[in-house]
Amino acid sequence: MTHLTIRASRPYSVYVEPDAIRRIHEVKQAQEADRFWIITDQTVADLHMASIRRQLENVFPVTAQHVSTVEPGEGSKSLSVYQRLLEEGIEQGATRKTMILAVGGGMIGDLAGFVAATFLRGVPFLQIPTTLLAHDSSVGGKVGLNLRWGKNLVGAFYQPSAVLYDPAFLQTLSDREWRSGFFELLKHGLLARPTFAEELIGLGLSDIKQLPLADWISAGIQVKQHIVEQDERETGIRAFLNYGHTFGHAVEYASEDLSHGEAVGIGLVFVSILEGNEYQTNRLVELIHRLGVVLPERQPFERYLELMKRDKKNDVSIRFVVKGQDGFSLEAIDQKRLKNAYDQTVRCLHWA
């Protein structure tokens, strides 16, 4: 069992353990809630909702429950789905004492968290992650929606009341979801735990599923905890958590069938080339092929350039989180270097 306390503007606990939902009785806002409004996607609802509702009833037998489901995938992080959820909240009688439970992966955490941040000017919410990828997104308080111009262009910083993470949920994940979460875990290792990263980068898909998950998830969360506690609202070093994400987000947004983490894997190759880190580039390319990532249809450089210009870290120039001799920094990269890195990424990955 891991118990961490995230010391943000509103401190909260993170539990990583079997049957973590039982910890809800320790959350003050849950004790005071007039109902639990569960927001999830249809896949998670089919797999886990009956069990989750029973566990909630065991702890709070008289607290009403309401479940809202959305379609799986990034398409649900939209203004139209957000509006439907707000209206559903009004129709089911939610109040400022209602607690939202975000049950699912990163998309659900972002969407349900943004509903919580804005419904009736803010109601409490819990993150209950069901994917490996969500070890990253469930901690730190970033919530939001996508627009047709790019990812996460509408959003807020809104901390959960707690994060209740049961690794048993991960046993129902597809291979793609395992890969997706693994690349975010690797990113945390590359940022702050080189030995951890070196262990991860040599693994295959079957190895990943046999990891001591609670320990490895906790290690990834602790990297993020250390950064978020210093820079909650991303005015400085929190931007380093976007390592591999500037190009990765562009690839993800331009592709219909690539997961977030798989796109981050490609983004890590791109940024390793920018850094001139040939060893890391080669290891990442080997890993991407070993894990069976199916590369998306490649778009022209100009399309990715357009999407990178919309990244929230960028103003006049396109800035990347890069590692140099003195550690990580945000560096403005000119278009010529970006095109060169793109061409090398295409060659290294044999990206048709």
Curated annotation (Swiss-Prot):
Q: Give the cofactor note text.
A: Binds 1 divalent metal cation per subunit. Can use either Co(2+) or Zn(2+).
**Enzyme Commission no:** 4.2.3.4
Give the family this protein belongs to, as stated in its UniProt record: Belongs to the sugar phosphate cyclases superfamily. Dehydroquinate synthase family.
State the Gene Ontology BP annotations: amino acid biosynthetic process; aromatic amino acid family biosynthetic process; chorismate biosynthetic process
Q: From which residue to which does the signal peptide run?
A: none
* Pathway linked to the protein: Metabolic intermediate biosynthesis; chorismate biosynthesis; chorismate from D-erythrose 4-phosphate and phosphoenolpyruvate: step 2/7
User: Where, by residue number, does NAD(+) bind?
Assistant: 130-131, 142, 151, 169-172
The answer to whether keyword Disulfide bond applies is: no
| NCBIfam families assigned to the protein according to its UniProt record, in alphabetical order | aroB (TIGR01357)
Organism of origin is: Exiguobacterium sibiricum (strain DSM 17290 / CCUG 55495 / CIP 109462 / JCM 13490 / 255-15)
Question: Which reactions are catalysed by this chain?
Answer: 7-phospho-2-dehydro-3-deoxy-D-arabino-heptonate = 3-dehydroquinate + phosphate
Checking InterPro entries in the record gives: Dehydroquinate_synthase (IPR050071), DHQ_synth_AroB (IPR016037), DHQ_synth_fam (IPR030963), DHQS/DOIS_N (IPR030960), DHQS_C (IPR056179)
Q: Which HAMAP family match?
A: DHQ_synthase
Q: Where does Zn(2+) bind?
A: 184, 245, 260
Q: What is this protein called?
A: 3-dehydroquinate synthase
Report the transmembrane regions from the record: none
This protein's cofactor list reads: Co(2+); Zn(2+); NAD(+)
